[in-house]
Swiss-Prot record:
<dbReference type="GO" id="GO:0006397">
    <property type="term" value="P:mRNA processing"/>
</dbReference>
<feature type="compositionally biased region" description="Low complexity">
    <location>
        <begin position="1299"/>
        <end position="1309"/>
    </location>
</feature>
<dbReference type="InterPro" id="IPR006569">
    <property type="entry name" value="CID_dom"/>
</dbReference>
<feature type="region of interest" description="Disordered">
    <location>
        <begin position="203"/>
        <end position="319"/>
    </location>
</feature>
<dbReference type="Pfam" id="PF00855">
    <property type="entry name" value="PWWP"/>
</dbReference>
<keyword id="KW-0507">mRNA processing</keyword>
<feature type="region of interest" description="Disordered">
    <location>
        <begin position="427"/>
        <end position="451"/>
    </location>
</feature>
<feature type="domain" description="PWWP">
    <location>
        <begin position="24"/>
        <end position="81"/>
    </location>
</feature>
<feature type="compositionally biased region" description="Basic and acidic residues">
    <location>
        <begin position="111"/>
        <end position="124"/>
    </location>
</feature>
<feature type="compositionally biased region" description="Pro residues">
    <location>
        <begin position="1229"/>
        <end position="1244"/>
    </location>
</feature>
<dbReference type="InterPro" id="IPR000313">
    <property type="entry name" value="PWWP_dom"/>
</dbReference>
<feature type="compositionally biased region" description="Basic and acidic residues">
    <location>
        <begin position="1275"/>
        <end position="1298"/>
    </location>
</feature>
<feature type="region of interest" description="Disordered">
    <location>
        <begin position="1128"/>
        <end position="1366"/>
    </location>
</feature>
<feature type="compositionally biased region" description="Basic and acidic residues">
    <location>
        <begin position="391"/>
        <end position="403"/>
    </location>
</feature>
<keyword id="KW-0539">Nucleus</keyword>
<protein>
    <recommendedName>
        <fullName>Protein HUA2-LIKE 2</fullName>
    </recommendedName>
</protein>
<keyword id="KW-0805">Transcription regulation</keyword>
Length: 1366
């Protein structure tokens, strides 16, 4: 019997198989609990000092640079489908995830490009297929002659068999020459070829992240061109090296690892001895590990020094040179920092050229200049012709010298032929190339000059508009081409500045056709070259100048992606005669190309406007190139920088905007710091001439136009000066940058697009520096634009601001190297930051749009805001938040957003140091806007106001913001909460009223819910707010506004209304108020005796709660005075009064007797109560109505106004129902009753007194008095009239009788009968169909058994009337 299989055995085997399926370097999506499937790459645990686990897959996550062991089931391969899905869903998952997606996509594209590079056919096809991502390969750009075309056709085989190409010395040289000769056609072809097969310079975009991609892209291009193939192999190797370096930077690998693969590729590429110097140069350049003497060695390593020295390796010379830089750097076992690999590569160890080789000869420049220069001459010549006639003439002379080129080395021969071809195709090619070339390509290094004199020191003209232009920064890198080659080289690279520029322009244009060649080497050496450019900036910047005429072409060139590699190549081609290394050669080639675009105009003395124009077009192209071609620029800059480091101080002088952007080196730092923005900075820092200009331009953001100064004149001193100037610019720029960038913060704002636009021609800067691929200039802008990044800018500054002009080139080189190192880190960091900022900002905006009042949502948005603060854009984050809050229509969400502000503030408060103050200061400045948006004016925002007050009080308690500021805003919110009560009738929203609020019964009445329409009827009468006093119930306040009580809530109203039971009064009424009211009642009792003589109307003086004395005297007098006025007949009054609302009951029948008139019927009281008097009125209403001295029938009419609120007439808006409340609260004396011990006196109000004889019962009270408070001063009625009736005279008196038909007699109201209490039954007056519910169950008046009518308000004691006795 077979043994039973162990349970789970198959599962374990499956797991192991799945683990084995994943290989190191595979791109995957790994799922970790709590996170989405995260982009990662399979790595080796050993590299991270972790013990391997056979059952798990060890991955390194992109974006966060974290590692983890994942189950095989949680790891899935990264495919094209997954790529598309991630692109659509990345923005809602945070900045880290967005960054991770970008990185894995770049790596994915890089791997695909590497595969294509390894397979020439696939590489060529791939490059053609990915035109949008790549710039045209030199081969594509160039339209070779029939031979060159044939060679190009055979290029795939050559690319396939690079070693074969290298071995074919003569054939390769011939091919190179033919290709260059046909560079003009190629340029034309570039126009078409660019479209046909853009080389995978798209890897340049990858280069943004890692230089390896650039080199890889360059490799396919190199394969495309046979002549370039010599470079191509090295390029491929360099690209691989760079790619590995990039991978190392991304994956933490060291350059050594990269070297291994790259060196192997380089070793595979052997150049034949017959290749002559160009081959030797290429080989030497490829032999980055070998010395210059070893250039003849079989291994073709890229060494820019050798290339420069030899100038023989035309194709490989410039390109290989760039590769050399990377190789050298690798060779030097330098560990490339992530994102800084290329820049560090710039630090490539320079190897001494072979003693046999001439540093100053054109040969030095020729290796690169030939390969690149030949392609460039025509392209560059076009530009140069436009820019500088001299350079063009010299260039022309060179071709003449090269007519019999058989005796010339292959490289020189190729150059001569290229130049001739260039002249033929100059016009057509220049336009085509201009279109094809990217802004970076447009950046033309100054002509590679044979000697310092040849080097043209001219400043880059930066677009005066900082935000729009980074004026041909590439000029610097192009200018950095300091070539002291043989006369032939001079014709292209070694020519005098003007000549070099001309030829450079030609080469540039031709090189635009040969951009592949220039790009490839540049790309490969982009990292190192970029660093070289950084080192070169001081010296080569002098030579580099963007010709105005060239600039237009440059603009054209910049327009096309393919141009970018050429420009970069040109920059790399920057070669000084002093620069012996191969980098010089590659720089020379690149420089010539760059010069062709940038230098000629300046050499020809054209205006900066051309440069600026070129910059404009370059900016446009650059935006595109930044995505794809920026890598090329970085490569070029690196090559140039390495050259500058190795060779002359003139390189130190070179400062390109794009280079500064792409190059994290001194130049970039200087530009960044000096100008605050690349656009502001001068691309070129001339040794002596540029020195003064640069600081100015840095401050003024103006384009510094440097004069063309030969390297000979400039010399080391100028290089030193340039370095010094650059440093000064850095220091000056640090301050200016901060200011200017803050000013141009909108344009800079770390937006990749803006940074791309601002980035000048310099390819290296825009392309390589940031591992993220964000334009370096943007990073610079970002840092400069924010004070928070100011420190970074300061750190960017590399050396001391001033360097003695007497210093030697070595000093300059050392300084430049240091600056390059610094700038490399800074630029890359800035690019990464820029990309991070953009993604974080998008995530932040998404979080604001989807914010809800939950801890998770607010916490996530807070974290994103903190991330933005780290990037230095806290002010922008708060601006976005304020804008979102202001544009939010939902009031509830406004509170949510304000809670986010609170979260950010408290989180910032918890931070240590000055970082916590960043947001707090921003919040403090923008807080008024935030509060105005969160709590807009209106009565419907009370909830928002409450929540904001809570937040502010919490801030006050925790001292989040200065106490004075917080208290100020709290007071404002409090005032806003009070104002609406006064401005908008104090009626609370229906939903805010308590269920037992009598207002609910009055909803259909025209009077307000508190039984008064005084607010509507007394427009000129200012009613003070009683929100706070309702509880206190002061007479003055109550008298001021019958609505004062209405403002209060139902409970408040009850507590203030004197009709409430004593328990309520005790709860809500202050003792002092109660005492005061008690005195008033006693006085009122005393005044009841005076009522006989005085009319019941003590109006004027009793408008507000009067003290007892005032009420006694003034009320009586006023009553007498106004008595005749009010003593109109009820009928007359009713006629003049407004009609009753449809819902109001008919007026009550007249009381049976004058006693009835004198006494208020229960129904009247009820009606009055139903009138909805609130606390203010109710303060005195609560007291029993007291009978005043007998009055004529007219007095009954006067009491009518109180009841008129309930009468149909009084219900109308015209009837001031508030009068009733005033009446109740008037201090006017009512019947003195021996019994009525006044209950706890309610708050005094103007309505505390009523008209004598008017016994008012709240509309709310039922007919029975048992539910009402035991007393209310009858003077309330009088007071009622005082406040409101005086405003409305006779017409309102009708209200008094709304329950009583007007009595025929107008005699004294007070008769003997009326002295006796009137039973409620004595009133036949009309009452409401449904007696209003008692207000908060307050007891109504308790009629005495013998009472003939309702007890007067003033006499209302618990359950009984107090009849006045004579």
């Amino acid at each position: 019997m077979a043994p039973s299989r162990r349970k789970g055995g198959g599962k374990a085997a499956a797991v192991a198989a799945a683990c084995r399926k994943r290989k190191v370097g595979d791109l995957v999506l790994a799922k970790v609990k709590g996170f989405p499937a995260w982009p990662a790459v399979v790595s080796e645990p050993e590299k991270w000092d972790a013990s391997p686990d056979s059952k798990k897959v060890f991955v390194h996550f992109f974006g966060t640079q974290q590692i983890a062991f994942c189950n095989p089931g949680d790891v899935e391969a990264f495919t094209e489908e997954r790529k598309q899905s991630l692109l659509t869903r990345r923005h809602a998952k945070g900045s880290d995830f967005v960054r991770a997606v970008k990185e894995i996509i770049e790596s994915y594209e890089k791997l695909k490009q590497q595969e294509r590079a390894s397979d020439p056919k696939s590489a060529e096809e791939g490059t053609l297929g990915s035109a949008e991502n790549t710039t045209l390969m030199p081969q594509v750009i160039e339209i070779p002659t029939a031979t060159s075309l044939t060679q190009m056709n055979s290029d795939p085989s050559h690319g396939r068999d690079e070693s074969t190409l290298l071995n074919e010395d003569a054939s390769a040289a011939e091919q190179m020459l033919a290709l260059r000769d046909n560079s003009g056609p190629r340029n034309k072809a570039c126009d078409s070829a660019v479209v046909k097969e853009p080389r995978k310079i798209a890897t340049y975009s990858s280069r943004k992240r890692n230089g390896g991609v650039r080199s890889q892209n360059c490799a396919p291009q190199n394969e495309t061109c046979p002549v370039q193939r010599s470079k191509s192999p090295s390029r491929l190797q360099t690209e691989k090296l760079q790619s590995s370096m990039l991978q190392n930077s991304d994956g933490g690998q060291t350059i050594d690892d990269v070297e291994d693969g790259a060196l192997r590729r380089e070793k595979r590429i052997r150049r034949s001895s017959g290749h002559s110097e160009s081959d030797d140069v290429a080989t030497s350049s490829l032999n980055s590990h070998g010395s210059d003497e070893e250039n003849a060695s079989e291994i073709a390593t890229v060494e820019s020094d050798n290339n420069r020295n030899e100038g023989n390796g035309v194709d490989s010379g410039s390109k290989v040179e760039q590769i050399d830089i990377g190789g050298k750097f690798l060779e030097g076992d330098y560990d490339l920092n992530k994102g800084l690999n290329f820049q560090i590569n710039i630090m490539v160890k320079r190897k001494k050229r072979k003693p046999t080789r001439k540093r100053g000869t054109s040969d030095v420049v020729d290796p690169q200049a030939k390969v690149e220069g030949e392609a460039v001459p025509e392209a560059g010549a076009r530009n140069n012709v436009q820019t500088s006639q001299n350079s063009h003439e010299k260039f022309t002379e060179r071709p003449c010298e090269e007519n019999g080129d058989e005796h010339l080395p292959l490289v020189k021969r190729a150059r001569v032929r290229m130049s001739r071809a260039f002249y033929g195709n100059h016009e057509a090619n220049s336009s085509l190339q201009a279109e094809e070339r990217s802004p970076k390509d447009t950046v033309v290094s100054a002509t590679a000059q044979t000697s310092p004199s040849d080097i043209i020191s001219s400043h880059d003209t930066f677009a005066v508009e900082e935000s729009k232009f980074f004026e041909v920064s590439a000029k610097l890198s192009g200018d950095m081409v300091n070539v002291a080659p043989s006369p032939v080289e001079k014709s292209h690279d070694g020519m005098s500045p003007s000549e070099a520029c001309v030829q450079t322009v030609r080469e540039r244009e031709y090189a635009m056709g040969w951009n592949e060649l220039s790009k490839t080497p540049d790309d490969k050496s982009a990292g190192p070259q970029y660093n070289q450019v950084s080192s070169l900036p001081a010296g080569e910047a002098q030579t580099a100048s963007v010709p105005e005429a060239v600039c237009p072409e440059v603009l054209k060139l910049l327009t096309s992606e393919s141009d970018l590699p050429a420009v970069q190549y040109c920059q790399v081609a920057k070669i000084e005669p002093s620069m012996d290394p191969n980098t010089v050669d590659s720089s020379a080639n690149n420089a010539s190309e760059i010069c062709s675009l940038s230098i000629p105009s300046q050499l020809s003395g054209q205006d900066r406007s051309n440069d600026q124009d070129a910059c404009v077009s370059l900016e446009n192209s650059r935006e595109y190139l930044n995505e794809e071609g920026s890598k090329i620029d970085a490569c070029v800059a690196q090559v140039v920088q390495s050259e500058a480091i190795e060779h002359s101080p003139s390189s130190c002088l070179v400062v390109n905007k794009q280079e500064t952007e792409n190059m994290p080196k001194t130049v970039n730092m200087l530009l960044k710091e000096g100008h605050g923005s690349l656009g502001e900075e001068c691309a070129i820092v001339e040794p002596a001439q540029c020195t003064p200009n640069l600081p100015i331009s840095a401050t003024e953001s103006d384009v510094i136009v440097g004069e063309n100064v030969p390297l000979n004149e400039i010399g080391c001193t100028k290089c030193e000066d340039a370095v010094e100037d650059s440093r000064q610019l850095k220091m000056i720029g640090e301050t200016n940058d901060q200011k200017q960038q803050v000013q141009t913060n909108n344009s800079v704002l770390v937006s990749e697009n803006l940074s791309r636009e601002k980035m000048s021609f310099s390819p290296a800067i825009t392309a390589d520096t940031p591992a993220r691929g964000t334009p370096h200039s943007s990073s610079v802008y970002y840092h400069i634009s924010t004070s928070e990044s100011a420190n970074d800018m300061q750190n960017n500054s590399s050396g001391s601001p001033n360097i003695p002009t007497g210093e030697k080139k070595n000093d300059c080189d050392a300084i430049v190297k240091e600056e390059e190192k610094i700038e490399t880190g800074v630029c890359q960091g800035q690019k990464v930051v820029s990309c991070d900022v953009q993604s974080t900002r998008e995530s932040y905006e998404d979080a604001l749009c989807s914010l809800v009042r939950t801890k998770e949502s607010i916490g996530r948005a807070t974290c994103l805001a903190m991330d933005l603060m780290k990037f230095g854009v806290s002010a922008k984050a708060m601006e976005i938040l304020a804008h979102t809050l202001e544009s939010e229509s939902n009031l509830k969400r406004r509170v949510d957003l304000f809670f986010l502000v609170d979260s950010i503030a408290q989180c910032s408060k918890g931070l240590k140091g000055d970082t916590g103050c960043v947001y707090l200061s921003a919040i403090q400045v923008i807080l008024p806007r935030l509060l105005a948006a969160a709590v807009p004016a209106g009565a419907t925002t009370q909830e928002n106001r409450k929540q904001c007050l809570k937040v502010l009080k919490l801030w006050l308690e925790r001292r989040i913001l200065p106490e004075s500021i917080v208290r100020h805003h709290i007071r404002e919110l409090d005032s806003h909460s009070i104002v609406p009560a006064c401005l908008y009738s104090r009626r609370s929203a229906r939903t805010e009223r308590s269920l037992d609020d009598p207002v609910r019964d009055m909803e259909d009445m025209l009077v307000d819910e508190y039984g008064s329409n005084s607010t509507l009827q007394l427009p000129g009468f200012c009613m003070p707010a009683l929100l706070k006093d309702e509880e206190g119930g002061s007479d003055s306040e109550g008298g001021c506004d019958s609505e004062g009580g209405s403002d209060s809530d139902g409970g408040d109203f009850e507590s203030v209304t004197p009709e409430h039971e004593s328990r309520i009064l005790e709860e809500n009424v202050s003792s002092s108020t109660a005492e005061r009211h008690t005195l008033i009642l006693e006085d009122v009792d005393g005044e009841l005796e005076m009522e006989d003589v005085a009319p019941p109307w003590g109006t004027e003086n009793c408008t507000h709660t009067d003290q007892a004395d005032n009420t006694k005297v003034s009320n009586c007098q006023l009553g007498q005075q106004h008595r005749p006025v009010f003593g109109t007949s009820h009928q007359h009054m009713s006629l003049s009064s407004p009609p009753l609302p449809s819902s109001s009951p008919p007026p009550p029948p007249a009381p049976p007797s004058q006693q009835g008139e004198c006494a208020m019927p229960d129904s009247y009281l009820n009606g009055f109560e139903n009138g909805g008097y609130r606390n203010v009125h109710g303060d005195q209403q609560a007291g029993p109505l007291r009978m005043n001295p007998p009055l004529s029938g007219s007095t009954m009419h006067y009491q009518g106004p109180e009841s008129s609120y309930i009468s149909g007439v009084q219900l109308t808006n015209s009837i001031p129902q508030a009068d009733g409340s005033n009446f109740q609260h008037r201090p006017y004396p009512s019947h003195p009753h021996p019994h009525p011990p006044p209950p706890p006196p309610p708050p005094q109000h103007q309505f505390s007194f009523r008209e004598p004889g008017h016994v008012l019962k709240s509309h709310r009270d039922a007919p029975s008095y048992s539910h009402r408070s035991h007393y209310v001063p009858n003077c309330d009625e009088r007071n009622f009239h005082d406040n409101h009736e005086r405003m409305r005279h006779a017409p309102f008196e009708n209200r008094d009788n709304w329950r009583y038909p007007p009595s025929s007699s107008y005699g004294s109201r007070y008769q003997d009968e009326h002295k006796a209490p009137y039973p409620s039954s004595s009133y036949n007056g009309v009452r409401w169909d449904n007696p209003p519910r008692q207000y908060n169950n307050r007891p109504s008046f308790h009629p005495k058994p013998h009472s003939e009518g309702p007890a007067p308000v003033g006499m209302r004691d618990p359950g009984m009337w107090h009849q006045r006795s004579d």
